[in-house]
């Protein structure tokens, strides 16, 4: 399998903001016999943040079109195909945020290098929006923090689009050291995109 095909399996956004890690082994787990994702081309899967900014500056892409592409990619890889379970939930306001940032770019120019760039953040990073923050647990299901975390606040100020909450090892491994890496009650078992019968290792598995 070549590098482009590997990248095509794993890409869902241009940047992923993660916190924390844990030095545990990548043990195999019992996985359903899903076929890998199709080889249909995904135009943005190797794009860097600089590439995306250049594309928006030239008019080739907009924040909305990029966001739509990554939402479709999440659906293709998490909801169908290999079912990576890398994402716990997506932001229902992502497209309206993208539209507002496109309008701002037209009227004032970009705020900076993250303007209009979709990012996914770990599910233990507070966001005050229509997404919940649960550390992957059912105990906190439905929990909406009263304010953004410092990280989320700074991302929004920079013009980034908080696209989704990434799956993680529940409670960032505080539920037990023998727990499977990348498993949470809300997200299920996150799968290693390079070897679908193995886990992705670490707390920040999504």
What are these regions (language model features)?
Residues 17-18:
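Membrane transport/envelope proteins' first extracytoplasmic loop
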Residues 32-206:
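Gly/Ser-rich catalytic/binding loops embedded in alpha/beta enzyme cores
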Residues 1-14:
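N-terminal secretory signal peptides and thylakoid transit peptides that target proteins
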């Amino acid at each position: 399998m070549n590098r482009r095909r590997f990248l095509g399996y794993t890409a869902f956004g241009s940047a992923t903001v993660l916190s924390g890690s844990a030095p545990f082994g990548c043990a195999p787990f019992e996985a359903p016999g899903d076929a890998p994702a199709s080889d249909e081309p995904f135009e943005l899967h190797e794009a860097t943040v600089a590439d995306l900014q250049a594309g928006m500056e030239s008019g080739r892409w907009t924040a909305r079109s990029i966001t739509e592409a990554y939402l479709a990619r999440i659906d293709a890889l998490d909801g169908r195909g290999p079912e990576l379970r890398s994402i716990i939930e997506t932001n229902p306001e992502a497209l309206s945020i993208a539209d507002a940032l496109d309008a701002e770019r037209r009227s004032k120019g970009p705020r900076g290098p993250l303007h209009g760039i979709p990012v996914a953040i770990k599910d233990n990073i507070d966001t005050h929006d229509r997404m919940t923050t649960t550390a992957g647990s059912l105990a906190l299901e439905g929990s909406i923090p009263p304010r953004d975390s410092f990280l989320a606040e700074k991302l929004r100020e920079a013009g980034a689009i908080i696209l989704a909450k990434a799956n993680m090892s529940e409670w960032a491994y505080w539920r037990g050291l023998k727990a499977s890496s990348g498993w949470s009650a809300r997200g299920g078992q996150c799968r290693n995109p390079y070897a679908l019968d193995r886990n992705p290792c670490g707390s920040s598995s999504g």
